[in-house]
Amino acid sequence: MEKFTAKLRDIQETKFPIVKAAFKGKDEQIYIGVMMIDTGSVNCILNKSVLPNLNDDAAIEGKTMKIHSVQGRGVECQGYSLSFRIGNGVFSDTFYVNKEMDFDQMFDGPFIGIIGHEFLRRNNMVLDYETETLHASEGSIKGNPEDYAFFFTMSYGLKQYNIPVVGLVYGDKEYLMVADSGANDTVITKHLMDDAGICVRHLDNEGTVTCFTTDTLETALYDVTLSIISVGGTPECPKLYTQNDKVQVISNCQYIMDGLKDAEGNDLMPISGMLSSNFMHKNKWVLDFGTGVMFQRKDE
C-alpha cells in the first residue's frame, strides 16, 4: 500500500504549511482549494465560506465546541462532517466553524480549512519542514537524541496542555511556548522578553496579531535569543538549542495562556509564546506526530 504523502506549497511564499485539498459537495461537484496544517490547533476548522457547498446534512446535530485562542478567549463553533482528499489520501473528520471569521482574506486562493494536531496524531502524520511535505510516520526515530541538533518529545505538552510545547531556559528561569505552525511569526509576551533578558534589539513598533476569536492584538517587533531545551543534557546542565528570531511582542498581557490546571487540579506553568512556522521552516524542524517527537537533524 502506498504511504501517504502531500507536498507543501512554497512556505517562504505562503508563510504557513499549506496543502492542496479537495472535497465532494452538493450535486456531486468537486471543490478544490487549500488547507493549512496548524499544530497549535487541537481541532480541524472549516472556513465559513465553504458551508454553502456542503451537503445539507453535513452539520452534526448537538456537536458544538468552544474553541479558545490567546488569553483564554473563546468562540462557540458548530461541528460539520467533511470527507476530503489531500495528497494521495482520503480522510473524514469533524470540522468546526467560526461563523464570525472568514479565512479567505488571509490566504491566496479558495481556503477550505485548518487541519489540527488531533487529526495528525490519529493518522500518524509528520509535518516535515526539511522535505516540505506532510507524510506518514515511519513509527520510529533513528539514532539517539544526542545525534540531533534539537530533539524534544511532545508527550508533556500533549498530556498537560493538549498542544505540543517547547521549554525555554535562561539560568534558573523556565518558560513554555507552543510549537505553532499556524503562527507565521513567533509571538512572545513582553514579560518573557524582559524577565529573561533576551532582547537583542528593537526593530519596529507597528505590528498586529489576529486571533481565532477575530481579536487583533498590537505588537512590537524585536530580535531575541531563544534558548530552547533539548533532550540530552542533565538537570544541572541542560542541553540548549539556541537560535535568534524576529518576534512579535505582546505587551498587554503577562502570558499567552494562564490559569491552567492538570487533571488533578494542580496549577500548570503558563504559556508565554508561540514558536512560528517561519522559525521551524528556517531551521528544518520535523514534527512527527506518529512517534510524538520534534527534532532537527544535524548538518552533514
Q: Over which residues does each language-model region extend?
A:
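Pepsin/retropepsin-fold aspartyl endopeptidases
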Residues: 1-300
